[in-house]
UniProtKB/Swiss-Prot annotation:
Coarse class of the protein's main subcellular location: plastid
Localization in the cell: Plastid, Chloroplast thylakoid membrane
Cellular component GO terms held in the UniProt record: chloroplast thylakoid membrane; proton-transporting ATP synthase complex
Family per record: Belongs to the ATPase delta chain family.
Keyword flag ATP-binding: no
One Gene Ontology molecular-function label: proton-transporting ATP synthase activity, rotational mechanism
Record function comment: F(1)F(0) ATP synthase produces ATP from ADP in the presence of a proton or sodium gradient. F-type ATPases consist of two structural domains, F(1) containing the extramembraneous catalytic core and F(0) containing the membrane proton channel, linked together by a central stalk and a peripheral stalk. During catalysis, ATP synthesis in the catalytic domain of F(1) is coupled via a rotary mechanism of the central stalk subunits to proton translocation.
Annotated keywords: ATP synthesis, CF(1), Chloroplast, Hydrogen ion transport, Ion transport, Membrane, Plastid, Thylakoid, Transport
Membrane-protein topology: Peripheral membrane protein
UniProt-recorded name of the protein: ATP synthase subunit delta, chloroplastic
Naturally occurring in which organism (per UniProt): Rhodomonas salina
Domain of life (superkingdom): Eukaryota
Biological classification of the source: Eukaryota, Cryptophyceae, Pyrenomonadales, Pyrenomonadaceae, Rhodomonas
Length: 180
């Protein structure tokens, strides 16, 4: 997210968290994020200055009405009126982080060299809960074969890197060689 997007998104994300239905806020934000990530046409339509605000409202109502809380739809209408709907992705991402924080949910991004089994995933979640004292851990898993073996975890500002790739880098640094 660019610094301009962050500057624009933060106040709107704060406002959304204030007015949102507390029971559905995380589901609503996940629904918005999923719709935006899966539809490049939707992203283009709401970011296009040639598409009128009324047309953008119609698009949003047709996609989200009935799928998210009424206050969430109204909030997106306000974004259209203010000419800020193009920042919906950044606003949703920022608001989701705030909602997770309020619900004592930590987001952890995990890259592993192979797909983790359910037992490994559960063990990792338990360790991360103990480490962060969070009530819940939400994992975003991806496979990165360049790690050779092991995994990397980013949770908040902390990074845990147990990958073979990292160990080789450390070893080469110790030996004075360079590894590409």
């Amino acid at each position: 997210m660019s610094s301009k997007n962050v500057k624009v998104a933060k106040p709107y994300a704060d406002a959304f968290i204030e007015i949102a239905n507390k029971g559905s806020v995380i589901n609503d934000l996940n629904c918005i994020a999923t719709a935006l990530s899966e539809s490049k046409d939707l992203q283009k339509a709401i970011a296009n200055p040639l598409v009128s605000s009324a047309a953008k409202k119609d698009i949003i109502k047709s996609i989200f009405a009935g799928n998210v809380d009424e206050n969430t739809v109204k909030f997106m209408m306000v974004l259209c009126d203010r000419g800020r709907i193009e920042y919906l992705d950044a606003i949703a991402e920022t608001a989701l982080i705030l909602a997770y924080k309020q619900a004592s949910i930590e987001m952890a991004y995990v890259a592993s060299s192979v797909k983790l089994s359910s037992a490994q995933t559960e063990a990792l979640v338990d360790k991360l809960k103990a480490m962060t004292k969070a009530d819940q851990i939400k994992l975003e898993l991806k496979v990165d074969e360049s790690l050779i073996g092991g995994f990397k975890v980013q949770i908040g500002s902390r990074i845990i890197d147990t990958s073979v790739q990292n160990q080789l880098k450390q070893l080469s640094s110790y030996l004075g060689a360079s590894v590409a």
